[in-house]
A protein has these predicted regions:
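Generic detector of contiguous secondary-structure segments
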Residues: 49-61, 66, 123, 276-293, ...
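Acidic/His/Gly-enriched intrinsically disordered linker/tail segments
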Residues: 53-58, 72-164, 169, 177, ...
Length: 363
């Protein structure tokens, strides 16, 4: 996990690190106190699960972050920690490599060292594929700092495309190690990773990134050509002025129910009729599962995750539904963590997660 980062866990301060397991929260992980403690939130995602056990994915990904943060406690960077403490380490991690490159490097690690990893999922770089195919080639900064008009994937995807592309195209698996050691030796070089890019690729950072984009588009285009012919399609909704995303589509008779959201809009449930006219149904949760319609009653069910009002490290899941022709939401009360309901007449089947890691089907 640590080899190509140039550091190992504990190299900066020579101490062991506690790992705290949280089994009451949504899937996530963090390296706190920069880096003095690892927190693993072990309940796997019910809406975007990985084929590998979530605890394994977390262990590999967060362990890489531990090694990444060691450089701020070594060489010429170390004296600054005497004055600024742990704040300095997190600051230099954001200034020198940046959050995108750090997360992209960690995704490369989880992909390389496990049979799964986000780098192997089909939708992780899919937006770039579609964007390039429509002539949408942007500079790195425009992909990173999006606007209300132009969308972009999160910094995990951008970092993976960048770091993975450099490794693939220029054969430099030691890229992060070179950058970290340069930043540790010469704190005054705030562009240490730009310097490393020029050294290992012979090009400026943005030019090297654009070459990665061109190369990936060539590979993706060849793959797309081999998959022809495609099913023809046409737009159902009109083009919005600002970026808008329609997801979780559900066909109900002549209507389509969809979750609409964008950079300037919170998620809402909308109904699109056969004429393409959009009707607002209700506000919607940010973290929710797919829509499921019960044919006889016309009810639409889903599950959503919410944070406990008192304990913000504890999350709850509840099953909700709306009646046909209504926007009022109802809740199926249950103290368990229930996800992804499926309905048949008066019965509801749902997946139940246990704190210990087991899962069941509840009826």
């Amino acid at each position: 996990v640590s080899l190509t980062s140039g550091y190992v866990s504990g190299e900066g301060d020579g101490k062991k690190m506690p790992v705290v397991m949280h089994s009451y929260n949504a899937a996530n992980g963090s390296v706190a106190w920069a880096p003095k403690r690892m927190d693993l939130f072990t309940i796997p995602s019910a809406y975007d699960p990985e084929p590998l056990p979530w605890s394994t994915m977390l262990s590999v990904h967060e362990s890489r972050h531990i090694t990444q943060m060691q450089f701020g406690m070594t060489k010429a960077q170390k004296p600054f920690t005497w004055a600024f403490g742990q704040m300095w380490n997190i600051l230099v991690s954001l200034v020198y490599p940046g959050i995108s490159n750090m997360e992209g490097d960690a995704v490369i690690t989880e992909t390389a060292w496990t049979p799964s990893g986000r780098g192997r999922t089909a939708d992780f770089l899919n937006y770039y594929w579609v964007a390039f195919d429509n002539g949408d080639f942007r500079s790195w900064d425009k992909w990173r700092f999006v606007s209300q008009v132009n969308n972009a994937p999160d910094y995990y995807s951008l970092g993976y495309l960048t770091m993975g592309g450099f490794r693939y195209l220029y054969d430099c698996p030691e890229f992060m190690s070179e950058g970290y050691h340069l930043a540790a030796r010469r704190p005054y070089n705030l562009g240490a990773f730009y310097t490393t890019t020029r050294k290992l690729t012979g090009k400026k950072f943005n030019k090297a990134f654009m070459e990665v984009c061109d190369t990936m588009y060539t590979l993706w285009k060849a793959d797309a050509e081999a998959r022809k012919p495609y099913i023809p399609s046409e737009p159902v909704t009109s083009k919005s002025r600002f970026y808008t995303d329609y997801s979780n589509n559900l066909i109900a008779g002549n209507d389509i129910y969809s979750i609409k959201k964008g950079h300037s809009d919170a998620p809402i449930l909308v109904r699109i009729d056969s004429a393409g006219k959009e009707h607002r149904v209700s506000r919607f949760a940010y973290d929710a599962g797919r829509l499921q319609r019960e044919p006889e009653s016309g009810r639409i069910y889903w599950s959503e995750t919410s944070t406990d009002k008192r304990w913000n490290l504890q999350t709850k899941s509840r099953i909700r539904y709306i009646e046909k022709g209504s926007g009022r939401k109802h809740t199926v009360d249950n103290p368990q963590l229930l996800y992804n309901p499926s309905t048949c007449r008066s019965y509801i089947a749902a997946v139940r997660y246990e704190m210990g890691g087991k899962s069941y089907i509840d009826l």
